[in-house]
Curated annotation (Swiss-Prot):
Catalytic activity: an acyl phosphate + sn-glycerol 3-phosphate = a 1-acyl-sn-glycero-3-phosphate + phosphate
Subunit structure as annotated in this protein's UniProt entry: Probably interacts with PlsX.
EC number(s) stated in the UniProt entry for this protein: 2.3.1.275
GO BP terms: phospholipid biosynthetic process
Name of this protein: Glycerol-3-phosphate acyltransferase
Protein location: Cell inner membrane
Gene Ontology CC annotations of this record: plasma membrane
Enzyme class: transferase
Length: 204
């Protein structure tokens, strides 16, 4: 691995480590997303805590955290594998941020950015899948999980297995991070889109 590739991966991780949910809630003088609602510093919890505007800002920044480094890797290296690894590092930064004690979000919004950066078709697959599941079930977590699996595995059909591997690893990590959501979906206790923030319960 040359210096350029290494620098891009480090940049992706560090950018991913900037937790927009925590910063946005601080700016809007809202409770910390780590102590209210689900306890997850992500877009869905910010929506429950502060409404649409803070949530939209959080979502946009989290998407850009994935999009920007992947596009940079794509343009500067022209190497699909390095670009896919850049996506993985951005996700790792978001989920395990060095700036916030390695305790971050669940990576879904950042994944959207990486997918659009890697291939707009993959990004579109994610968004369409998420919307379809969300409209039918009103479960944000279920929508994210289904869209993550379908979009990540779709890379296999557009690239070779080596390039797809980082995205498959991302899917596994996101599934593991949603373990609590999966358990509540099975038990019927998972929060739905539009529910207000309650005591910390580790939902999406």
């Amino acid at each position: 691995m040359n210096f350029l590739n290494f620098s891009i991966l480090i940049f992706a991780y560090l950018l991913g480590s900037i937790n927009s949910a925590i910063i946005v809630c601080y700016i809007f003088r809202l409770p910390s997303p780590r102590s209210v609602g689900s306890g997850n510093p992500g877009t869905t919890n910010v929506l429950r805590i502060g409404g649409k505007v803070p949530a939209a800002i959080t979502l946009i920044f989290d998407i850009l955290k994935g999009l920007v480094p992947v596009v940079i890797a794509k343009v500067l290296t022209g190497n699909e594998f390095i670009t896919a690894c850049t996506a993985l590092y951005a996700i790792l930064g978001h989920i395990f941020p060095i700036f916030f004690g390695f305790k971050g979000g669940k990576g879904v919004a950042t994944l959207i950015g990486t997918l659009f950066g890697f291939s707009w078709i993959l990004g579109l697959i994610f968004v369409i899948t998420w919307l379809c599941v969300a409209i039918i079930t009103r479960y944000s977590s279920l929508s994210a999980l289904v869209a993550t699996v379908i979009a990540s595995f779709s890379v296999i059909f557009t690239s070779d297995l080596q390039v797809a591997a980082p995205f498959l690893i991302i899917a596994i990590i996101i599934l593991v991070k949603h373990k609590g959501n999966i358990q509540r979906l099975i038990s019927g206790q998972e929060s739905k889109i539009g529910d207000k923030a309650k005591a910390k319960n580790d939902s999406n």
